[in-house]
């Protein structure tokens, strides 16, 4: 609409995209710090607000009322109001979300707080409203005048500015990379970006007050969000901060309101043109240094490593991660199609002559997007789209213009901080004749989006041509976007891959003439874990009625399973099922269990949770609701407990003892002899869990510390190493891991008495067979037997390794034998010994086992074989012992 300002200048208020036109109609422009909920219904603005509406630029949409969502109630973010439309990308917590792409685009140039994307690495730091102005942060390091400043002084003592900035996550469009090959990042769709008006102080004003010294080159930022690897922090160059064209700001308002907790309340950094990961939230420190930040998150996040480096290989390349040339700062040119929407149908009989294809584009480093091209024939020819730059409307603000208490003085600035919108009218007849629509953007530096994807280990900065497939169906055109965010199904990329298409062949997975003669590999089959005939709906109350030992039910992916029939047969013992009773066991089950185990699930499937029950379980805290750090026993069978990594001690070239500090020095571990515990680590970027079972070396009665011997399986050419062991080896001291237990079907009670799946046995002789780090459960039982002079149980230990230096716990094992030489025998056999080895040589094969173990003594019935080692060893032992007439119930595999 045309409006006339008090200066007599007529402006046209533009709303883009043109449909639906609600950006201005729902605007608010209050300059106070109140966070009152605003009625979403458009109303006539009060007289004092009209001055704000008579502007040459758009104002942000009004926030709709929000509240704490049910899924957040039992998380550390239980105080934070959120919009239910946001799509969660990493489960319930931490909060990483993007809005539906169409909703984001339809809001127009500026996005509401409701739909602004969020990237949180952990819990949101809590800052009460009445403490916001008292929040302080420091400015120190290589400066002459370090100081601490409160938000109140930041507002009162410095000039304020307001201007629009588009923030973009470096992972925007990562889902496309994850479909091609799983990266270490979680799956963002194409809506990992948002634009808002930010109010605050140019950072250069603070730095000039501090007076950087001559050696200063970098500015490090650190937030208040405490994470597994310390507080989140990163850095940028000092000269960028001092350059007003860069527009780097210390912000305290977003769209005229004080910052929302998810967006950094009460103060944060805003860095236009760079990836969102540099704009640190909940700011506590600004430190000027001579080198880039050494913060863990600066080094191991927001990088584009060479495409040749796999996720597994990256775990053991610290020097590569620390190489600053792989760090991401400026955004690259990128674009997406928003209309037609994913799965939108255009009925040809009623369609207009043309269809308006439209979307967004953005550049980085202040560069403007100067062209957007569209092709309907895979790049053989291109059409030029029209581009609209709403950001330029703010450059036309009159002198002295104030918005939300900040000057909009940006007429002089040529750098581009925001996304732009493009559109093109295409004849429907041309769309009907095409197989797809593809676009590419170019910035003013003549950098154009690439045709093909550059895959990298973190899946960041993905910006190949954006492609929408056109399907002809029943007199209509159906449009299919490349992916859908998170775990949402849909998109042509998943469809093509399921059918065996090669997404890296340069033709978007379509068969080329050269590939027609090739037989494609069998598409990966998804294991069905449900029974299609089961239609029962189960409530939370019904599920909770089965949280005991008698008839335990558990949940995987929203489906309910009855574990009762498998209690006696579960390899991990009945406790593994009982401990999961009436709980969502999805993460543990999917992480630990084999494909064979998953294929067995349909026979135990009894129903599906209703929506209320699903939400209730999703919101359940993972840790005990009464997880008292002063409790006497550390392990909790149903809940994860945190232990801090204190030391790593090398015991061989590829094995270490990891020592973890418990909650307090008098706290016992709580692990019965012969049982094990679960250790969980989460990838800091993806939040995906890695869970493995380990048997500690610690004494059963040990207190305050937990020692675990772990063999590190490293990557070798052609064979990836151990995901968990390499992850454990790479985490720094002071990092915590999650631990839960005990689990296991075997427990040694002393003097030959033990239980197997709850059944009591009295054993006269144990045959213990192990290899490598499989010695640890054997170690536990042998120590218990030999430590008790009154325990007459005989033990034969057969320990296999490659070479002499690989024999783990050798001195300790020898000491155990020395304590009870009459009833304990220990034999070492090496498969690759050197010339000095005088012991047994070769593999633990049939002849070796027959010679030293002998057949099962039927008249006795009190012998038992305990086995722990690689799968190949366990299979050999199993088959040989069966041939020697040993019964399956007398063989136990840890």
Swiss-Prot record:
Cofactor dependence is on:
FAD; heme; Mo-molybdopterin
Name the species this protein comes from. Beauveria bassiana (White muscardine disease fungus)
Per UniProt, where does Mo-molybdopterin bind? Answer: 169
Q: Which InterPro entries match?
A: Cbr1-like_FAD-bd_dom, Cyt_B5-like_heme/steroid-bd, Cyt_B5-like_heme/steroid_sf, Cyt_B5_heme-BS, FAD-bd_FR_type, Flavoprot_Pyr_Nucl_cyt_Rdtase, FNR_nucleotide-bd, Ig_E-set
The EC number(s) given in the record are: 1.7.1.3
EC main group: oxidoreductase
Gene Ontology biological process terms, A to Z: nitrate assimilation; nitric oxide biosynthetic process; sulfur compound metabolic process
A GO molecular-function descriptor: molybdenum ion binding
| Name recorded for this polypeptide | Nitrate reductase [NADPH]
- Composition bias (Polar residues) maps to 7-16
Task: Tell whether Metal-binding is among the UniProt keywords.
Answer: yes
Annotated ranges, domain Cytochrome b5 heme-binding? 535-610
């Amino acid at each position: 609409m045309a409006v006339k300002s008090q200066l007599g200048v007529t402006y046209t208020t533009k709303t883009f995209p043109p449909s639906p036109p609600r950006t201005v109609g729902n605007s608010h422009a209050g300059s106070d710090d109140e966070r009152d909920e605003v009625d979403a219904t458009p109303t006539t603005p009060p007289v004092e607000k009209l001055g704000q509406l008579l502007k040459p630029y758009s104002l942000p949409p009004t926030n709709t009322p929000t509240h704490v969502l049910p899924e957040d109630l039992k998380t550390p973010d239980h105080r934070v109001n959120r919009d239910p439309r946001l799509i969660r990308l990493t489960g319930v917590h931490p909060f990483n979300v993007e809005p539906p792409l169409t909703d984001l685009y339809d809001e127009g140039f500026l996005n509401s707080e409701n739909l602004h994307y969020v990237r949180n690495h952990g819990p949101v730091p809590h800052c009460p409203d009445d403490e916001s102005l008292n929040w302080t942060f420091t400015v120190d390091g290589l400066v002459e005048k370090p100081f601490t400043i409160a938000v109140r002084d930041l507002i009162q003592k410095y000039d304020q500015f307001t201007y629009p900035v588009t923030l973009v996550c470096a992972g925007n469009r990562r889902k496309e990379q994850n479909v091609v090959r799983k990266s270490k990042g979680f799956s963002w769709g194409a809506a990992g970006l948002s634009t808002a008006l930010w109010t605050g102080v140019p950072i250069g004003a603070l730095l000039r007050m501090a007076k950087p010294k001559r050696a200063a080159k970098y500015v490090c930022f650190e937030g208040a969000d405490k994470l597994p690897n310390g507080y989140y922090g990163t850095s940028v160059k000092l000269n960028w901060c001092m350059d007003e064209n860069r527009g780097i700001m210390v912000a305290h308002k977003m769209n005229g309101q004080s910052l929302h907790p998810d967006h950094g309340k009460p103060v944060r950094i805003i860095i236009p043109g760079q990836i969102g990961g540099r704009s640190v939230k909940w700011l506590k420190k600004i430190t000027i240094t001579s080198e880039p930040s050494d913060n863990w998150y600066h080094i191991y996040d927001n990088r584009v490593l060479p495409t040749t480096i796999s996720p597994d290989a990256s775990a053991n390349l610290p020097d590569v991660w620390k190489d600053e040339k792989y760090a991401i700062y400026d955004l690259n040119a990128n674009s997406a199609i928003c209309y037609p929407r994913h799965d939108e149908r255009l009925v040809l009989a009623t369609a207009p002559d043309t269809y308006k294809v439209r979307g967004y584009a953005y550049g980085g480093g202040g560069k403007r997007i100067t062209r957007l091209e569209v092709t309907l024939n895979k790049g053989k020819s291109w059409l030029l789209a029209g581009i609209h730059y709403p950001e330029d409307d703010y450059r036309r603000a009159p002198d002295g213009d104030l918005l939300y208490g900040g000057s909009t003085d940006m007429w002089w600035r040529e750098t581009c901080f925001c996304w732009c919108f493009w559109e093109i009218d295409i004849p429907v007849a041309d769309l009907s004749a095409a197989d797809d629509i593809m676009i590419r953007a170019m910035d003013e530096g003549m950098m154009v989006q690439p045709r093909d994807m550059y895959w990298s280990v973190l899946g960041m900065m993905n910006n190949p041509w954006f492609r929408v497939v056109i399907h002809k169906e029943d007199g209509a055109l159906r449009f299919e976007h490349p992916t859908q965010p998170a775990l949402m199904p849909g998109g042509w990329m998943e469809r093509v891959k399921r059918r065996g298409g090669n997404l890296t062949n340069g033709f978007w997975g379509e068969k080329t003439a050269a590939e027609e003669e090739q037989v494609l590999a069998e598409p990966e089959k998804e294991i069905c874990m449900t029974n299609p005939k089961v239609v029962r709906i189960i409530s939370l109350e019904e599920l909770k009625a089965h949280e005991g030992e008698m008839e335990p039910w558990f949940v995987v992916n929203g489906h309910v399973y009855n574990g009762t029939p498998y209690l006696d047969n579960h390899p991990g013992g009945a406790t593994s099922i009982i401990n999961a009773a009436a709980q969502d066991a999805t993460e543990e089950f999917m992480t630990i269990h084999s494909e064979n185990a998953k294929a067995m699930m349909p026979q135990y499937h009894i129903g599906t949770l209703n929506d209320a029950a699903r939400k209730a379980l999703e919101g359940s805290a993972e840790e005990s609701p009464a997880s008292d750090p002063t409790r006497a026993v550390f392990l909790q069978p149903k809940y994860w407990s945190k232990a801090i990594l204190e030391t790593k001690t090398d015991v061989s070239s590829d094995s270490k003892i990891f020592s973890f500090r418990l909650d307090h020095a008098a706290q016992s571990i709580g692990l019965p002899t012969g049982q094990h515990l679960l250790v969980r680590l989460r990838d800091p970027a993806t939040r995906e869990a890695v869970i493995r079972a380990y048997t500690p070396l610690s004494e059963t009665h040990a207190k305050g510390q937990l020692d675990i011997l772990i063999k590190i399986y490293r990557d070798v050419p052609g064979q990836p190493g151990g995901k968990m062991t390499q992850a454990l080896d790479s985490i720094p001291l002071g990092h915590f891991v999650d631990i839960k237990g005990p689990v296991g079907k075997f427990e040694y009670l002393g003097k030959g008495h033990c239980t197997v799946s709850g059944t009591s046995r009295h054993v006269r002789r144990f045959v213990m067979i192990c290899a490598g780090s499989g010695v640890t459960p054997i170690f536990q039982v042998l120590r218990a037997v030999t430590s008790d002079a009154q325990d007459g149980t005989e033990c034969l230990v057969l320990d296999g390794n490659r070479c002499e230096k690989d024999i783990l716990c050798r001195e300790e094992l020898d000491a155990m034998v020395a304590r009870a030489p009459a009833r304990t025998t220990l034999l070492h056999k090496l498969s690759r010994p050197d010339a000095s080895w005088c012991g047994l040589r070769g593999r633990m094969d049939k002849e070796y086992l027959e010679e030293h173990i002998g057949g099962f003594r039927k008249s006795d019935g009190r012998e038992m074989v305990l086995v722990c080692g690689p799968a190949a060893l366990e299979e050999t032992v199993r088959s040989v012992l069966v041939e020697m007439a040993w019964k399956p119930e007398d063989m136990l595999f840890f």
